[in-house]
């Protein structure tokens, strides 16, 4: 996993690896499609001048944390992608990706749950 990615690079990586269209990424990051498109269309040199968490992207931070934990738990991308769409008892029988899309608080819940599981593993 790349360690020196910025928030926008992580969001793009999530979109590609999880095979999400712009609307799906918008739903699980809780960032408007127009905002995502604005930042994704920036040139690399323009991105360098942005703050660590660019305006309007604060709700996407738990998604990056979720992604990082899932990559640690499931090095196999196919298993990771399967985990996202299979009903899970940790989330009251809901699919994790659907829980993430419910609200920023639900996204944080998924992120927190995965972080807790990661800490429990040796």
Language-model features and meaning:
Residues 1-122:
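Non-transmembrane "mature" sequence context
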């Amino acid at each position: 996993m790349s360690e020196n990615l910025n928030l926008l690079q992580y969001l793009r990586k999530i979109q590609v690896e999880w095979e999400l269209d712009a609307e799906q990424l918008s739903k699980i990051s809780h960032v408007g499609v127009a905002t995502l498109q604005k930042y994704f269309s920036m040139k690399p040199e323009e991105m360098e001048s942005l703050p660590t968490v660019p305006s309007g992207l604060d709700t996407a931070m738990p998604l990056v944390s979720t992604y990082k934990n899932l990559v640690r738990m499931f090095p196999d991308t196919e298993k990771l992608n399967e985990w996202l769409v299979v009903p899970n008892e940790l989330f009251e029988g809901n699919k994790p990706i659907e829980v993430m899309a419910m609200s920023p608080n639900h996204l944080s819940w998924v992120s927190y749950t995965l972080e807790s599981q990661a800490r429990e593993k040796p």
